[in-house]
Amino acid sequence: MLQIPFNILDEGFTHGDDPTQPPTVQIEARVAGCFDDGRLRQAMGVALNQHPLARARLEPWTDETVTYEWLIDDVPQVDPMSVVAAATDADVDRIRSELQSHPVSIFESPPLRARLVHRQGGDYLMLAIHHAASDGMGALRLLQSVLRAYANVDDPQPQLDPLDVHRLPVPEFEPGIAELWHAARMEFERFARMGSFPEHLPPQGATARAGYGIQSIHLPLAPISSAPLRTELGASVNDLLITAATLACARWIETHADAVPDRITVTMPINARPKEWRNEVVGNFVTADVVSTSAEERTSARDCLASVAGWTDAVKRVGPGPALAALAAIPSGPVSGRRAFAQWASQAGARFADTTVLSNLGRVNKEWLDTDQLEITELWFSPPTSLPTGLGLGAIATTDRLFLSLRHSWRLWSSEATAQFADTLVTALDEICT
């Protein structure tokens, strides 16, 4: 059995653990045809063996503990997979929601749960991974290993020690003039916008029910990739999605709060893995930035996209180095003190919580699962969310389709309200792309 310390991101997601809003990362694939139960369970075991953090559990800690530790079991303590059948798409939605809404314990290994859903027209493999154990990119990598093992194809691992890189070392950062200018600009913009709080989405059909609902929509990728505004402004697909989310949130507030919103903020997770292994390693290697727009910057879809693209371009130029350095500078001490501070900060800082979160895993190409044994027809992903934000958007694309998941707290919206917001989001995206 191995033992390794948490990195600062693992700790943050542990401190944010709320059983009524579990910090689960949703990742799932649908295939053409049916999975064999026993063969898939065996493939899951092979994949867990490939990735140490997928077999991790939290070592019990005391008030004097200075660093949380992961215990890496040679063999997982429990079988994470269950098998169910779905007769309708509504059944699939319910199963998906229940899986992501059920707390995943990190005191036993593996820190995840899997559900095989038999459905006419193609089976689903759904994973719910505790965010303390992995971010979305790591979850996608684990899913890839499961599917490769099932298809009996090679699953090459990068030439690195996943437990060593898990320390989250701060990359060397020697900014040039351009990087310094962009960093200064970002800080100036942040300071200028401190005079107003982020807007929050008004509830619609909210209940006291714990957990999440998840609305799933898929769109053709080509009209988004080839959008004229994208070419004109040098924007990315992610920029278009953030812009659509920003406009949709603003319109929702205008409609349901009868007010003109000021500052709409979108949390944008950033993959801090180096380019040499950008899509590798189960674990947490993600920082985040906030894309903020004022009402003046949202007067048109073009203006909003220009503002968003300018901000994300500056973020890319600066890179993750400063954010990782800031995280590394957090004072040490007993974990009990840091846990208490994190809980206080979460409550005290609720007014500063962002309007929504949009996490994009990018495009999965054919080589991701290069086999004739399995045909992937759908991929779904969503990040966890908590009130007062209450809405987390997840995006992932294949060669020709974009899959969007809208995860909402039941304490914010009903399924009907989320469906209305999804329509608003798609309308905004259409406006940007035409």
Question: Where do the protein language model's features map onto the residues?
Answer:
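Flexible, P/S/T/G-rich "lid" or insertion loops adjacent to the active sites of thioester-utilizing
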Residues: W181-A235
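Intrinsically disordered, low-complexity regions enriched in acidic/Ser/Thr/Pro/Gln residues
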Residues: P158-R193
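Helical lid/core segments from catalytic subdomains that handle acyl or acyl-like groups
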Residues: I214-S216, E280-L369
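Long, internal scaffold/assembly segments composed of regular secondary structure
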Residues: Y212-T287, V291-T293
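Non-catalytic N-terminal regions of enzymes
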Residues: M1-E172, S236-A257, L369-T434
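A residue-level signal for beta-strand positions that form part of recognition/binding surfaces
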Residues: P111, T265, F352-T355, R401
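A broadly conserved detector of short glycine/acidic/proline-rich loop/turn motifs that flank catalytic sites
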Residues: I270-P274, N360-V364, A397-T399, H408
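A general secondary-structure junction signal
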Residues: L58-T62, H118, M268-A272, N360-G362
